[in-house]
């Protein structure tokens, strides 16, 4: 029956919205019993210095997963709790990379030193390659790999570590890297960061 003489009008039936799927908890991939494959891949194929790699391994920031033998780069919060992980395949015939499900983008793979400078990279291997090239007193400085396009890891580190006053944007030397660097620089300056400057590799990225 139509009310108030309203004829020819249609009314949409109400549907209760479906319950949003609950976010799965963050879980690190199971560790392999040894790290032979990631050491071979990162040192021989990608040219990372073995001693530099070992520092990160001993800090439990890099390990090899048991199922696929990926290199896993762990990101921790201010209390040292793992809450982000980036996986990189170690096969020389297939390329794979991606973040573990439910990783918190604010806490990607990073290293904290005591100086006032933070070096920012697109990927963990770029970060390790830069340190391999410039090893002198590297542990004094801070480094972060964005593991994506977000600037959240930088903003979180600046909040957690007020001693950081300078940010070097060591992104890829390509159109995307230059554009992202300009965007991030503007954001950081607006947030009160004292000094933000680009630091480009000689070639496209720090591992070439």
Residue positions per predicted region:
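TOPRIM fold recognition
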Residues: 116, 132-208
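Residue-level signal for functionally critical sites in structured catalytic/ligand-binding pockets
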Residues: 42-45, 86-90, 122, 126-129, ...
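Short, structured coil/loop segments at alpha-helix boundaries
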Residues: 2-4, 32-39, 49-50, 65-66, ...
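Phosphate-handling DNA/RNA-contact segment within nucleic-acid enzymes
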Residues: 65-160
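Replication-associated primase and helicase/ATPase modules
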Residues: 1-33, 37-44, 168, 182-208
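Basic, glycine-enriched DNA-binding surface that flanks or lies within the catalytic cores of DNA
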Residues: 9, 13-103, 109
């Amino acid at each position: 029956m139509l009310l108030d003489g309203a004829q020819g009008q249609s009314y949409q039936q109400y549907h209760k919205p479906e319950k949003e799927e609950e976010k799965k908890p963050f879980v690190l991939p199971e560790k392999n019993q040894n790290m032979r494959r990631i050491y071979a891949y990162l040192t021989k194929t990608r040219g990372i210095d073995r001693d530099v790699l070992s520092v990160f391994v001993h800090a439990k920031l890099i390990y090899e997963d048991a199922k696929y033998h990926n290199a896993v780069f762990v990101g921790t919060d201010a209390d040292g709790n793992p809450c982000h992980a980036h996986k990189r395949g170690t096969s020389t015939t297939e390329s794979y990379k991606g973040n573990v499900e439910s990783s918190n983008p604010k806490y990607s793979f990073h290293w904290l030193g005591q100086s006032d400078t933070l070096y920012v990279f697109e990927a963990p291997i770029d970060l390790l390659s830069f340190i391999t090239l410039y090893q002198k007193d590297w542990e004094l400085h801070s480094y972060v790999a964005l593991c994506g396009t977000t600037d959240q890891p930088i903003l979180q580190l600046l909040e957690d570590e007020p001693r950081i006053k300078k940010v070097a944007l060591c992104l890829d030397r390509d159109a995307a890297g230059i554009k992202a660097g300009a965007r991030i620089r503007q954001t950081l300056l607006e947030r009160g960061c004292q000094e933000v400057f680009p630091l480009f590799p000689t070639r496209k990225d720090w591992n070439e």
